[in-house]
Amino acid sequence: MNPEIFNKQYLMTAGPTPLPPRVSQVMAEPIAYHRAPAFVEVYERALERLPKVFQTANDVLSFAASGSGAMESAVANLAVPGEPAVVASAGKFGQRWAELCEAFGADTTHLEFEWGEKVDPERVGESLAALGRPARAIFATQSETSTGVINDVRALAEVARAHNTLLVVDAISGLGAVDLPQDEWGVDVVIGGSQKSLMTPPGLAFAAASERALAAAAENPGRRYYFDWSRTAKGQREQP
């Protein structure tokens, strides 16, 4: 008998994180049919409780995707080709915002800070003022996994409001571990993932979007399907 079978490994990575035993036990059960009443009941209960995790009164959109999928959904719904978008990065996943914005054709201003340093909200504000026209959104990271730095999301939200633009925050590795009261701070979009501090299996990604962000997405003429927020919100309400 292979002794490796009985070795218990403990993950010390930023994600995926270790699963609580009761979660692992459920994962060993037979797969459920996603249209069955029992599954729908669990799904609806999860959707009902997710806003508490994000500290918001808004619905949380759920996708079968990696965290990067939910990040792409934010860019697909909010960025417009040729229109300004500002990215503030200080690590690998901040850079991903810039790559996404450029892929969708946004006129991207990428403010790159030294890895290991925090994003400077004042410089973000100066960059917005220098654009000469409103930015569609600021894209930033709460907890930069590549360095461990926690950015000042509250200050970035104040900058966004002062310049009448949206703030989109990747909180994939911080959500559930670092406080981020979305509604209280006025953060328009918070992106989350199941496999980090929430300690559940990989495969789910979330976008908690404010009414202002959803309105901006509804007016965006860009093409999208799976990551279309309006379609996803409608599906969650009407046919889970």
Spell out what each predicted region is.
Residues 183-195:
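Conserved active-site segment immediately N-terminal to the catalytic lysine
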Residues 8-64, 68:
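A glycine-/small-polar-enriched, mobile loop at the entrance of the PLP active site in fold-type I
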Residues 18-19, 195-240:
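Active-site C-terminal subdomain of aminotransferase-like
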Residues 119-176, 189, 197:
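Active-site phosphate-binding strand-loop segment of PLP-dependent enzymes
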Residues 57-86, 90, 94-98:
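Conserved beta-loop-alpha segment that forms the PLP phosphate-binding cup at the N-terminus of a helix
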